[in-house]
Amino acid sequence: MTLTLVIGNKNYSSWSMRPWLALKAGGIAFEERSIPLYTGAADKKRILDVSPSGKVPALIDGDVTVWDSLAIIEYIAERFPEAGLWPADPAERAHARSISAEMHSGFAALRSECGMNLHRPVGAKVLSDNARADIARIGEIWTDCRQRFAKGGPFL
């Protein structure tokens, strides 16, 4: 049975890109279906037809629908353990899940001030103290993970 990942625009939806990247990195076959975002009621209905939250991404696996990027990644990690999406060691896996949850639910100031838009020209930006604190915390997380777990592969 083919998995179908329903996503928004890859240029604007970092939430959509998370499970897309996990599926690609895991070598898991899937069909990609893109629904335009911010285009009106018809597209909102198309999203609601596949996602109870009315948001993308959503993963369809036969009769199973999973929505929310982190829930999708958890599902595919369980469904395809050979893909190695989570570390095998329980302590390392717990650490990875904790960081994933923090990345998933935190950093509101940074998300607000630096939303994903791959087509926007890059330039100097004045960030709030909260956004700078978010960036500093992300730097701490990444540094810690690379120092502790770099031997495990190229990913944090």
Model regions and ranges:
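GST-like domain detector, emphasizing the conserved glutathione-binding G-site
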Residues: 1-127
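GST-like fold's C-terminal all-alpha helical module
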Residues: 107-156
